[in-house]
Amino acid sequence: MLNLAADFIKHCKPSETTIVYHGGCGDGLAAAAILLRTFQKLFGSMPKAKFASPSVVSKLNLHNKTIIFVDLAVDQEKDYVLGLAKNSRVLILDHHQMVNNLNKEGILHVHPDLFGKIPGVRYPGAKLAFDVCSLITNIDDLDWLVLIGLFHDVGAEYWKPFIDKVFAKYHELGKVTYEYKGKIAELIAIITAGQELRRGNELALKVLLEADRPSDILEAYSPEVEELIAANKEREKELIYYVENWEKLADYNRKLKLVIYDVELKHKISSALSTALSKRHPDLTFVVMNQESPSVLKLNFRQTLEKVDCNWLAKASTEPFGGNGGGHKPAAGARIHPKFKEKFKEKVRELLKAKYSI
């Protein structure tokens, strides 16, 4: 299956191709950078790149002859993708929980669950893109980009030999680790800080396209990196406050081991906040709520040990309110209208009570 994807890319024309990636996501950004830099090596130029979130990807107006989706579960938007496929060649490189196998519809849908033993949730988009592109040309110089995806999407435990090799190659990363900490965590935080800036996704991607190694980013080699670092420092202050004060501020149901954390954030850190809390308290299920706009309540679900299927919980708890959500077992996201906030909280408790037979 990886060979089929490699062959697909070999027959692309950059001027007729669009790469659509998961914006604001370390894994999505790294995967896009790997694909774009592979195109540069292979063809001498790069295709267009567009970012999207899972909730809005089906609203994109795409007309290119070739469309590559990376780190986006577009199989959940089956009708949209089938519509694109009428006039375009479509390749999907994704690792989120699969709803529809679009290979049955004549679309090249590359997903780890279809070809390997490593669970898709632990086979991030950046590693998937790297493995495909490695079959096309030598991209060993892009191996450090894979770490951004592996650690951002909590897949490091499954790739220790690869990680050992990359850490040994780039001494600026410090001592090898398989946890989200140290220099690799700092690198990811800088890249994802682009969410706070106007055209921040484009800025973060530009940085990844131009950097030769991690130190180019960690040591602020350009004005663009300095801008990302400044944004990250402001994010970190708010993140630390909410991580340290969750027991005072959140609704904690000890019986259900459920924490519903309704926060008012200045920065786009709800995903990072839920991940940080879940890492510190792996036995608990966290639901972080943040009103992004008058019509959007953003929800982040985390259960690091997979005791609760967050993908299921995100979908089941928001569907009655016209919401949409999904992701992986340990981590998922969703959106609903703020007017359903209290009913949503009751629905989450109801679902978990049924699960635990309480």
Task: Label the model's feature ranges.
Residues 155-244:
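Accessory alpha-helical/coil subdomains and C-terminal extensions
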Residues 245-246, 261-262:
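Extended amphipathic secondary-structure runs
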Residues 248-254:
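Coiled-coil termination/hinge junctions
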